[in-house]
Amino acid sequence: MASRKLRFAIFGNTYQPKKSVSIQKLLACLSVRQAEVIIEREFYTFLTDGQRLPIEGVSIFDQSDFNADFVVSMGGDGTFLRAASMVGAKQIPILGVNTGRLGFLADVKAQEIERTIDALYEGDYTVDTRAVIKVETDGQPLKGYSCALNDVAILKRDNASMITIHATVNGDYLTTYQADGLVMSTPTGSTAYSLSNGGPIIVPGTHVFSLTAVAPHSLNVRPIVFSEDCEIKLTVESRTHNYLVALDGRSENLPETTRLTLRKAPYRVKVIKRAGTKYFHTLREKMMWGADQRG
């Protein structure tokens, strides 16, 4: 279906030597298609210096300084999240090739690379659009990318004591959490950190976010689901006078005087899904629902 040369931007993690076979397969497939290939510098260095792969005919880019028709993430969901942060608001669809472990986002297996690339050229795929959380501060600005595809976590640090988090929704007081932290999750991130803290699984495409406490002091505290159009404001109190904020695992320390505003970002991330991919099949497979582990 594609009548012009397509450009593919490739991201990957740098701690899985086994992915060298997968990247070689991907590059060979794209070469046959005469695609233009650009590789993030850190990943390129890992492949050429660390793995000593002979990679030719590609260009190199740094972090978010690129443009492309498609982005390919080689790794697990963590690599996909990093790629998504680099894509930002560019609206470039992302394909996740799983060389990691769980792989909700990176759900293309290495042995499926060739036919998946063929499907891209033939237009035989769908694109999911996923909501993103944007974080704003009223004091010290965040040092890195201020949006999260999975979740935003506010956590205690350097102390066994809990933190206190005052939360409002659209200006209305919600509650005061006394806990080790609080996780605001998108539907995409609902099967990640939020789930491990008892949060709900939310089907992608559902226009909601959730708040889930991390080890709350009160058993009456329960997760809450609200419209993605809501604005959440958080004020933190801590005995150490600071706290940790983590956006898709990218963390930094903030003084407790810094108040946070969390809302839906003005763009969505485009996630490539192969034709015929069913969310509930993936969910059932990854969560091993119905699997008999008795041996």
Where are these regions (language model features)?
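Catalytic core of DAGKc-family lipid kinases
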Residues: R101-D180
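Gly/Ser/Thr-rich active-site loops/lids in small-molecule metabolic enzymes
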Residues: T175-A179, V183-N220
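Short glycine/serine/threonine-rich phosphate/pyrophosphate-binding segments
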Residues: K19-S20, G78-A83, T191-S196
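ATP/NTP phosphate-donor binding region
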Residues: M1-F70, Q111-T126, T137-S146
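ATP/nucleoside-binding phosphotransfer catalytic cores, i.e., glycine-rich phosphate-binding loops
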Residues: I154, N170-Y173, L219-G295
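Gly/Ser-rich helix-loop-strand patches that form or flank binding pockets
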Residues: M86-V97, F104
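Short gly/pro/ser/thr-enriched loop/turn and capping motifs at secondary-structure boundaries
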Residues: F46, G100-L105, I201-I202, S218-L219
